[in-house]
Amino acid sequence: MNFPYRNIVVLTGAGISAESGIQTFRAQDGLWENHRIEDVATPEGFARDPDLVQDFYNQRRKKLQDPNIEPNAAHLALGRLEAELDGQVTIVTQNIDNLHERGGNKNIIHMHGELLKSRCSVSNQVIEETGDILTGDLCHCCQMPSQMRPHVVWFGEMPLRMGEIYSALETADLFISIGTSGVVYPAAGFVHDAKMHGAHTIEINLEPSAIESEFVEKRYGKASVEVPKLVEELLAHLESNVENA
């Protein structure tokens, strides 16, 4: 690695939050918490059975606020990296939880939305939401009050803040992917974009992802072990550069 890095982009997926007790979508059988994805994570599913979809996310929202769900060592290490790096750290997460915020990160892009927010299905106005959203809960920001929905990007919808993400990738000198499968686009293409602009690339995963060949460096193991080790290396080189200045 060419130390020190000043513009780091970190892409995180379900693998980083799994160790905190957040259950993930099982790609092998297409189920999420025993529900079919098309039933609970698509606009069509919401139109077909809004009560089912609202209840599904209400349960996920309750689970996220369980006192036993806490940031793990990987989240805390990334928070430390942002706080101590002499430069920019951008967290681009596919996760809808708030564990990066609770781990200390501030510069976070939630490309798939946030579970603790809701939005108007017409105007897209977003509000904080810690309780249940029910069918019949209306947003009064519009001329015609409209149904509130989870602030979550469903399959078939456009991810959020893509312009900001691509701008960060253009200036990144280090791109790290943590806990991602490498099968969901556009996120799976970020490593290629970062490489095209000259960034060093690192994959941290339990096992090789579908795009592992795109990465220059690979580290396999638990995120709670591998991420703190990498952050220690990055900050140690930063300190040595300061001492030698």
UniProtKB/Swiss-Prot annotation:
Gene designation: cobB
Gene Ontology terms: cellular component: cytoplasm
Subcellular location: Cytoplasm
Cofactors demanded by this protein: Zn(2+)
Major location (coarse): cytoplasm
UniProt keyword annotations, A-Z: Cytoplasm, Metal-binding, NAD, Transferase, Zinc
Catalytic reaction equation(s): N(6)-acetyl-L-lysyl-[protein] + NAD(+) + H2O = 2''-O-acetyl-ADP-D-ribose + nicotinamide + L-lysyl-[protein]; N(6)-succinyl-L-lysyl-[protein] + NAD(+) + H2O = 2''-O-succinyl-ADP-D-ribose + nicotinamide + L-lysyl-[protein]
Protein name: NAD-dependent protein deacylase
UniProt binding sites for Zn(2+): C120, C139
Function: NAD-dependent lysine deacetylase and desuccinylase that specifically removes acetyl and succinyl groups on target proteins. Modulates the activities of several proteins which are inactive in their acylated form.
Record remark: domains: 2 residues (Tyr-57 and Arg-60) present in a large hydrophobic pocket are probably involved in substrate specificity. They are important for desuccinylation activity, but dispensable for deacetylation activity.
The organism's taxonomic lineage, starting at the top: Bacteria, Pseudomonadati, Pseudomonadota, Gammaproteobacteria, Vibrionales
Record: residues binding NAD(+): 13-32, 94-97, 179-181, 205-207, 223
Enzyme class: transferase
Cofactor note: Binds 1 zinc ion per subunit.
A GO MF label: histone deacetylase activity, NAD-dependent
Residue ranges of domain Deacetylase sirtuin-type in the record: 1-237
Binding site residues for substrate: Y57, R60
PROSITE patterns: SIRTUIN
Lineage top rank: taxon: Bacteria
Record-stated family: Belongs to the sirtuin family. Class III subfamily.
Catalytic residues (positions): H112 (proton acceptor)
Its EC number(s): 2.3.1.286
Residue pairs linked by disulfide bridges in the UniProt entry: none
